[in-house]
């Protein structure tokens, strides 16, 4: 994607922004792969965009999350003998993966809003398309 922007300082800022997005997404791919390899993908059974950002903070929270996990088929059919400590390991992989997703969304959206006032509209279409694709990742 080539953008012709007059201000060289703005070009540097956009390059740094998109370069940092590249690295965040690269980290996300690695963490996502490790999440799959450890079968951690279903350890958090509810997707709570805002309230789910905090991990369990005490033993009672851990018990609640573990009890929710015990209700899904993955636990009943495959991990029925899993202990709390084993659950915590897979939980953390999934939590980091989801946290990175939120971080990537914000790290893209906030500069996008700022640059929306600095860049010509015809160049913004591609940047907003990328944001749309980020939002609809599964």
Predicted regions and their residues:
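Structural signal for the C-terminal ends of transmembrane alpha-helices
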Residues: 113-119
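Lipid-exposed faces of alpha-helical membrane segments in multi-pass integral membrane proteins
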Residues: 20-27, 31, 103-113, 129-136
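Membrane-interfacial loop-to-transmembrane alpha-helix junctions, especially the N-terminal start
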Residues: 14-18, 121-131
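Histidine-/acidic- and/or cysteine-rich, low-complexity loops and terminal segments associated
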Residues: 36-84
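N-terminal signal-anchor transmembrane alpha helix
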Residues: 13-52
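Individual transmembrane alpha-helix segments
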Residues: 68-108
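Short, Lys/Arg-rich, polar N-terminal cytosolic tail immediately upstream
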Residues: 1-10
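Aromatic/pi-system hotspot detector in well-structured domains
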Residues: 32, 93, 97, 137
């Amino acid at each position: 994607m080539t953008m012709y922007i007059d201000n060289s300082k703005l070009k540097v800022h956009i390059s740094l922004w998109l370069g940092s997005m590249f690295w965040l997404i690269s980290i996300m791919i690695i963490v996502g792969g490790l999440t799959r390899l450890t079968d951690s993908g279903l350890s958090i059974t509810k997707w709570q965009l805002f309230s789910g950002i905090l991990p369990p903070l005490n033993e009672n929270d851990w018990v609640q999350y573990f009890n929710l996990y015990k209700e899904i088929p993955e636990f009943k059919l495959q991990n029925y003998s899993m202990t709390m400590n084993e659950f915590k390991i897979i939980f953390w992989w999934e939590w980091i993966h989801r946290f990175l997703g939120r971080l990537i969304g914000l790290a893209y959206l906030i500069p996008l809003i700022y640059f929306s006032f600095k860049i010509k509209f015809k160049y913004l279409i591609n940047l907003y398309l990328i944001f749309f694709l980020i939002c609809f990742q599964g």
